[in-house]
Amino acid sequence: MREQRATAPRTKPALLTRLNRMTGDGTPVVTYSIIAVSVFVYLLQLIPALGVTEALLYAGAYSYPQFFEPWRMLTSVFVHSTGGFPFHILLNMYTLWIFGSLLERMLGRWRFLVVYLLSGLAGSLGVLFLAAPNVAVVGASGAIFGVISAFLVIHQRLGANMTQLVVLVAINLVIGFIPGFGISWQAHLGGLIGGALLGLIFVQTRKRSQQTLQIALLIALAAVMILLSFSKFLV
């Protein structure tokens, strides 16, 4: 019996096998995971008693010493407007599915995650510095603008013609300035700038011999963003 057990082939659960295939064939796992988490959080938001939206949204006031809750600068990226038809989350997740999948395959999973999170943080910094402290924001738009911006910068620097995408981004940015749409242009602009900086870092340090420099620049950029998030302590 012992000999039979030792020689018998070991089988993996179907779920583990599928996950191994996904992580090995270029499937944009991080993009899909972000979409899944965002949808799950949205469903929780629909239960008023949980108070998810109020607990995770961001406003500039939460970066002031009196109300300091810095985690909201990132958690707000995963919550969306729940009023009426779920247009907000559907549009954001559809856009993320398109550009996130492309950028993740290009950069790899961990680099893409860095782009998404730091772009989201940059979007919140835009709200902190450009919006009134009591203006609350939710949504992944800042992070997604960063993803698109990084995608655009990388392709532009590599010689691709990105004119149509530049026009599309410009139109969406301008729409944010139109009163009545309820769009946070501040988050869009912040994410756009953050994503562009990240794109420049990746495209300028794409050689294998520059990996240490790339990591150092990413850490430096993240450190600057974190320091900026504490800026209201100096006021």
Model-derived regions, located:
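Membrane-interface helix-boundary motifs at transmembrane edges
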Residues: E104-L107, H155-A160, Q204-T212
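Membrane-embedded alpha-helical segments of multi-pass transporters/permeases
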Residues: L125-F129, G159, A196, L200
